[in-house]
Each structure stands twice: as structure tokens, then as C-alpha cells.
A protein has these predicted regions:
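The feature captures two recurrent sequence modes
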Residues: 1-94
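A contiguous, surface-oriented mixed alpha/beta subdomain in the mid-to-C-terminal portion of proteins
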Residues: 72, 76-141
Length: 141
């Protein structure tokens, strides 16, 4: 369903990542499957988290090249929008770009900057991430 939605909307790096991940169409991928691809391409891993996590934990994970993944799945009534991230959002929405070396390094650097930031600055960094990475800010030639 979502593959049709992203046609003509997603950048090539994201589409390349979708292909590299080889996400199954008939089941939820296992985190070990995602880790094998991410580690081979950029040295990243996914880290199981309960759902929303504190900013400190978020930046710690990114700084250690681990992307937080909540392992619950949304209900059929929540297919179009869910307020907190589920495994589909994390794997389909974020992991494809983490196969791209440039984006993976950007995310790693963002995590390190977040750890150096004050508590107040972390709020702004988290908002910037939310409004760009979460909602998808992209410009290509």
C-alpha cells in the first residue's frame, strides 16, 4: 500500500534503501534482518525501544549509530496516522535512508551534537529533527 504512495514523492536515496533492505510484503521484518543490511552498508543497527523515548536516550542511540525502533504495530484503524512511532513507521520510514552513507553520517553527527547540547538546546534539536526528518524535507536536482 505505501509503496504506491511514495511513487514520485520519495528521493532516489530512499528508494535505493527500500531496495537494499528487501522488506518482505507478507510479514513484519525481524530486527536482525534489518541489522544485517544496515551494518553491511553503513555500520548502523536498530535498537528496540518501548515507544517514545526521552531526548537524551534518542541522542545517545543516534550517537552510537543505533536507530530506535518501537516494536509494536498499529491497529487497522490507525493505518493512516498514529501519534507515536510503531515498527512500520521506523522500518519503512527511516531505515531506508540509513543505508545511505551520507545520511547515516548526518544522523550520527546529529546524535553527537544532541549529546553536547544543553537541555534547552536538545528541545530545539528534537523539534528541528521532527519538522525535517520526520516529516520529510528533501530537495534534489
Amino acid at each position: 500500500r505505501q509503496l504506491k504512495v511514495i511513487e514520485g514523492r520519495a528521493c532516489q536515496e530512499y528508494l535505493d534503501g527500500i531496495e537494499q533492505l528487501g522488506l518482505p510484503h507478507d510479514r513484519i521484518p525481524q530486527l536482525d534482518e534489518i541489522n544485517r543490511v544496515l551494518q553491511a552498508t553503513t555500520g548502523w543497527r536498530v535498537a528496540r525501544v518501548p515507544a517514545l523515548i526521552p531526548f537524551q536516550t534518542f541522542f545517545e542511540l543516534l550517537a552510537s549509530q543505533q536507530f530506535p525502533v518501537a516494536t509494536f504495530i498499529r491497529t487497522p484503524e490507525e493505518l493512516d496516522y498514529l501519534q507515536e512511532p510503531d515498527i512500520f513507521h521506523e522500518i519503512f520510514g527511516h531505515c531506508p535512508l540509513l543505508t545511505n552513507p551520507w545520511f547515516a553520517e548526518f544522523t550520527h553527527t546529529y546524535g553527537k551534537l544532541g549529546l553536547k547540547a544543553s537541555k534547552e538546546e536538545r528541545v530545539f534539536l528534537a523539534r528541528l529533527y521532527w519538522m525535517t526528518i520526520e516529516f520529510g524535507l528533501v530537495e534534489t536536482d
